[in-house]
Amino acid sequence: MITVLLADDQALVRAGFRALLDSQDDLRVVGEAADGAAAVRLAGELVPDVVLMDIRMPVEDGLSATRRIVADPALDGVRVVVLTTFELDEYVFAAIRNGASGFLVKDTEPVELLRAVRSVAAGDALLSPGVTRRLIEEFAQRSREPAAVGQLAPLTEREREVLGLVGEGLTNDEIATRWVVSPATVKTHVNRAMAKLGARDRAQLVIVAYETGLVRPGWS
C-alpha cells in the first residue's frame, strides 16, 4: 500500500485528488494539509510514502516545506512531488533542487497522476518534458565549475556512464537493453552512484548529470 499526504490550500483540489487516489486498491490518502507548515508536521507524524505538495500555500510555501521534509533524516523514505498550475512555474526548478522527486501540473490526466505517484514511490524521477527543458536551459547558461565536476571523482567508469544515461532520461529497463544486462544490474549501478553522490533519488541524479556537464544541452 502506497500512502499519500496531500498538501494544497484549495479544499476542492484536495478532495479531487483524494477521491482519485482512494479509488485505487494500492493507494491511500493518509492526511491532508492546507499549508506548508501543516504539511511538514503531518509528514513527521504520518511518514507517508509520497507527499503531493502545492508550491503556493499560506503560512509556509511548498518550497520551504519540501526543503524541511527532505532535510529530516527521519523522513528519508518520503518522496515529495510538487504541484503547480503551469508547467514552467518559476519555482519548479528550485523545488527539484531542494529535494523534490518530481513535478506535476494540477490538470494532469488522472491516469498520469496515478502512474506518477506509483513511479515516485518506487524511486523513479518524475520530470516532464517541460521541466527537462528548463533544466537544460538552466545549465546551458553555466560553465562547469571544478567543484561540481569533482562530485564525479568517487564514481567508477560504469557509474559515470549510468549517471549520464539517467540524466538523459532513460529508465533502468532502457539502460539494461542498451547494455545487454539485467535491469537488476543497472539498478545496482544506479544505487551505488546515488550513495556516492548523496542523491535521494533519480531526480537528484539528473541534476548532478547536468550540473557536472556529464550530460550537455542538445544531447539525446
Region annotations inferred by a language model:
Residues V13, M53, P58-V59:
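The feature encodes the CheY-like receiver
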Residues G169-Q204:
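Recognition helix of helix-turn-helix DNA-binding domains
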Residues V92-R97, G102, K106-E157, E161, ...:
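Short, flexible helix-to-coil linker/hinge segments that flank and couple to helix-turn-helix
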Residues D8, D54, T84:
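Active-site residues of response regulator receiver
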Residues D35-A38, V59-R67:
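Acidic catalytic/metal-coordinating carboxylates
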